[in-house]
Amino acid sequence: MDHSMSKKLHDEALLHIVGGVNSPSRSNKGVGGGIPVTMERASGAYFYDVDGNKYIDYLAAFGPIITGHAHPHITEAITKAAQNGVLYGTPTKHEITFAKMLKEAIPSLEKVRFTNSGTEAVMTTIRVARAYTGRDKIIKFAGCYHGHFDLVLVEAGSGPSTLGIPDSAGVTKSTAEEVITVPFNDLDSFKEALAIWGDQVAAVLVEPIVGNFGMVAPEDGFLEAVNELAHVNGSLVIYDEVITAFRFMYGGAQNYLGVIPDLTAMGKIIGGGLPIGAYGGRIDIMEKVAPLGPAYQAGTHAGNPASILSGIACLEVLQEEGLYERFEKYGSMLKDGIEKAAAKHNIAVTVNQIVGALTVYFTEDPVTNYAEAGATNGELFGRFFKGMLEEGINLAPSKYEAWFITSAHSEADILETIQAVDTVFGKMVQDN
């Protein structure tokens, strides 16, 4: 494929934008470098770049675009918002409609508050949990991404008995020491952390199904035990459903798994492609939020009509009968096709697939936590990513990220993708 215009634009972007991108995940650093493709437009399941190339898209903007690009119903809602004014700074009736829709879909959301992003939503749930419990520390799980605010840019110390250390320049040591990080799916480490730090722990922050070192499901009984142990300890449980809400069913991963948190943070899908976040939970906890309580949260753009109307339209699309069954069918088809192609070419892969989301790891071993995901072959994934791009398949540029199937993907798209996988695996073997 010709990418000369993408290269030209990236060179220009480097002169004006830090690193040439507005989010580091777009830089292709995770796949060994190379020029990121600059897209011109998107429609349905497809991207079209500035050089005129067409791609089947599984990036889905890192998750939000579950209905495909430029879905007519969502586009109509956004157009209506633009015509009537996109920002008021006052209440609107649409906020009420959307809050009711979220509450009906995810019953643990007894009260809801809108924010501008998933990062803001997670950040505020932690503040509210601290206000409710009177405690300061949180427990999180290694490798789970919860946004880019200081408190969650923390990596594990040497074990559950040690406090966290900064995972980014600019995060203070004192902030990192408010966080205890333990491995996902490791109940013994979680118990150890609670035994040592329990009386200081305000909340346990959990991705109920991990989406940020690939799609990794909780082992049987893990989330139930986390809930029980946290509550015995007087700590709250926060589910970060920024990736998972409405991903696997019309509702949250908590509905899908049957395990209920005290607070939930959301983003991505619920905006229909526009920036949004939301959080909610038990009434007695949510009443700690201003103006009813002492935990302050505000935002000029929070609940803006454009994002709210886009979100309402997105959820209306997701109520289509049989949609999630189709996600499951196509997800299973992709997993099966990738595994067969890998076996044909004697390439070791593990595919973690949950409904319409999957991750392809270059390893023969199961992946159930961040350490196992980190041990997979990133060099092979980088070659695979670049090969798939040349075959017209757009993936996330990181071995840790998921593929997302949208309502716009067809069976023909899935079959074409499987053929591309077979072709790329064949070339990878030849190159060796």
Curated annotation (Swiss-Prot):
Pfam family, any one: Aminotran_3
One GO cellular component, as annotated: cytoplasm
Keyword terms of this UniProt record: Cytoplasm, Isomerase, Porphyrin biosynthesis, Pyridoxal phosphate
GO biological process per UniProt: protoporphyrinogen IX biosynthetic process
InterPro entries: 4pyrrol_synth_GluAld_NH2Trfase, Aminotrans_3, Aminotrans_3_PPA_site, PyrdxlP-dep_Trfase, PyrdxlP-dep_Trfase_major, PyrdxlP-dep_Trfase_small
Location in or out of the cell: Cytoplasm
EC number: 5.4.3.8
GO molecular function, a single term: pyridoxal phosphate binding
CDD domains in alphabetical order: OAT_like (cd00610)
Pathways per UniProt: Porphyrin-containing compound metabolism; protoporphyrin-IX biosynthesis; 5-aminolevulinate from L-glutamyl-tRNA(Glu): step 2/2
Keyword Isomerase in annotation: yes
Cofactor: pyridoxal 5'-phosphate
Reactions mediated catalytically: (S)-4-amino-5-oxopentanoate = 5-aminolevulinate
Keyword Isomerase belongs to the record: yes
Modified residues (N6-(pyridoxal phosphate)lysine): 268
Subunit structure of this chain's protein: Homodimer.
PANTHER family noted in UniProt: GLUTAMATE-1-SEMIALDEHYDE 2,1-AMINOMUTASE (PTHR43713), GLUTAMATE-1-SEMIALDEHYDE 2,1-AMINOMUTASE 2 (PTHR43713:SF1)
HAMAP family referenced in this protein's UniProt entry, alphabetically: HemL_aminotrans_3
Recorded family membership: Belongs to the class-III pyridoxal-phosphate-dependent aminotransferase family. HemL subfamily.
Protein name (record): Glutamate-1-semialdehyde 2,1-aminomutase 2
